């Protein structure tokens, strides 16, 4: 195990993580909830209809709920992302966009025309957050149109205005939107930690392991919900 990183401020506490523990100040930390929508976490949602295994989504929802309770009590900022597009799919891009070719939601709708207008469209059930993760007063909701939460969104300005330096990631899918957002945050000088049991992959189990390996080796840190709650659950309310 590597040596702990030197604390950045007096308010920091040490969060157990891989490859080394790191100091985290709740006042400059945001928990990012990536795409916990019916599309990704509910039977009959886009990911399920596209043939992906979503059996782990219910456990992830439960874990995230516990993390958010602790985060709010500790004074952390909570940010929810919802992925999708306008109901006419202009934001998704046409054939001139690689997103048109690679988005599995768009490909599923082209293969099944009866689903057109239902997947990842604002105003539709698929786009909405799952019932168990309803935002609370003070939480922030942001919209994104691509895998990374930093692309064409207000995330960076929201974080900088609040002095946020550390991002704790939860949500679906680890190997797509979670990793993409954490990577872009790294390039913008944000510290990123993913809670591995509060995320779920799109695809076989090995892609979860590969994404976590990439994160802890090159772009950030990996911790668990138990370590997060154990570290911050004893703090006085923020």
UniProtKB/Swiss-Prot annotation:
Root EC class: hydrolase
EC number, as in UniProt: 3.5.1.110
GO molecular-function terms, A-Z: hydrolase activity, acting on carbon-nitrogen (but not peptide) bonds, in linear amides
Catalytic activity as recorded in UniProt: (Z)-3-ureidoacrylate + H2O + H(+) = (Z)-3-aminoacrylate + NH4(+) + CO2; (Z)-3-ureidoacrylate + H2O = (Z)-3-aminoacrylate + carbamate + H(+); (Z)-2-methylureidoacrylate + H2O + H(+) = (Z)-2-methylaminoacrylate + NH4(+) + CO2
Keyword Hydrolase: yes
InterPro entries: Isochorismatase-like_dom, Isochorismatase-like_hydrls, Isochorismatase-like_sf, RutB
Keyword terms: Hydrolase
GO-annotated biological processes: nitrogen utilization; uracil catabolic process
Keyword GTP-binding on entry: no
Active site: 35 (proton acceptor), 144, 177 (nucleophile)
Family membership noted in the UniProt record: Belongs to the isochorismatase family. RutB subfamily.
NCBIfam families: RutB
PANTHER family recorded: ISOCHORISMATASE-LIKE DOMAIN-CONTAINING PROTEIN, PEROXYUREIDOACRYLATE/UREIDOACRYLATE AMIDOHYDROLASE-RELATED
Function (record text): Hydrolyzes ureidoacrylate to form aminoacrylate and carbamate. The carbamate hydrolyzes spontaneously, thereby releasing one of the nitrogen atoms of the pyrimidine ring as ammonia and one of its carbon atoms as CO2.
Protein name, UniProt field: Ureidoacrylate amidohydrolase RutB
């Amino acid at each position: 195990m590597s040596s702990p990183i030197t604390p950045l401020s007096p308010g920091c506490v040490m969060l157990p993580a891989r490859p080394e523990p790191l100091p985290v100040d709740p006042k400059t930390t945001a928990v990012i909830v990536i795409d916990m929508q019916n599309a990704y976490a509910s039977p009959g949602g886009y990911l399920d209809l596209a043939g992906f295994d979503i059996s782990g989504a219910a456990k992830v929802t439960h874990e995230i709920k516990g993390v958010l309770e602790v985060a709010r009590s500790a004074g952390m900022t909570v940010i929810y992302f919802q992925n999708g597009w306008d109901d006419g799919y202009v934001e998704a891009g046409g054939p001139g966009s690689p997103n048109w070719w690679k988005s599995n939601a768009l490909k599923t709708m082209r293969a099944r025309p009866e689903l057109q207008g239902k997947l990842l469209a604002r105003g539709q059930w698929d786009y909405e957050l799952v019932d168990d993760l309803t935002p609370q007063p003070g939480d922030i909701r942001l919209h994104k149109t691509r895998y990374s939460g930093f692309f064409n969104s207000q995330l960076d300005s929201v974080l900088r205005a609040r002095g946020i330096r550390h991002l704790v990631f939860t949500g679906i899918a680890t190997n797509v939107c979670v990793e993409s957002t954490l990577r872009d945050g790294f390039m913008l000088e944000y510290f990123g930690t993913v809670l591995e049991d509060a995320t779920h992959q799109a695809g076989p189990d090995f892609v979860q392991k590969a994404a976590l390996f990439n994160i802890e080796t090159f772009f950030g840190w990996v911790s668990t919900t138990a370590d997060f709650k154990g570290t911050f659950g004893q703090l006085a309310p923020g």
